Design a protein with these regions (language model features):
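Substrate-binding cleft and catalytic face of glycoside hydrolase catalytic domains
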Residues: 86-96
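Glycine/proline-rich, positively charged
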Residues: 95-114
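N-terminal binding-site loop/beta-alpha segment at the start of enzyme catalytic domains
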Residues: 1-84
C-alpha cells in the first residue's frame, strides 16, 4: 500500500480509502466489519463517512447508520488508533439532516456530539 503524510502530523494515510456510503442500507454491520478487516489486511487505514450516509436510498430512518456502524466496529475492535477517519457535513435542505437547518456552530456541535 502507498501512503501519504497527513500534513505535518506524522500520520501516514493510505492512498486508498474505504467508503461507507451504503453501510446501513445495502450493507449490514457484518458486511461492514468484513470490509474494514479486509481493507486493514491490505494496508488501507483510511475510512470515509458523512452525516447523511447511507444515501442508497437516503431516508430519515437510516440517516446516521453508517456512523453508528463504524462506531460499533471501533468499540468492538479497539483499533480506533489505527484508522484515519474522514467525515463530511451536508448543507441546508435535507429535512432528515439537522431538520433542514443551515450549517452553524450549534448545528455542527450537535452533529458531532449527538
Amino acid at each position: 500500500m502507498k501512503y501519504s503524510e497527513l500534513g505535518q502530523s506524522g500520520i501516514k494515510v493510505s492512498k486508498l480509502c474505504l467508503g461507507s456510503m451504503t453501510w446501513g442500507s445495502q450493507n449490514s454491520q457484518e458486511d461492514a466489519n468484513r470490509q474494514i478487516e479486509i481493507s486493514l489486511d491490505h494496508g488501507i487505514n483510511f475510512l470515509d463517512t458523512a452525516e447523511m450516509y447511507p444515501t442508497t436510498p437516503r431516508s430519515i430512518e437510516t440517516q446516521g447508520d453508517t456512523e453508528r456502524i463504524i462506531g460499533h466496529w471501533f468499540n468492538k475492535s479497539r483499533q480506533r488508533s489505527n484508522i484515519v477517519l474522514a467525515t463530511k457535513i451536508t448543507g441546508k435542505g435535507f429535512k432528515s439532516i439537522r431538520n433542514g437547518e443551515p450549517i452553524s456552530i450549534l448545528s455542527l456541535r450537535t452533529a458531532l456530539e449527538g
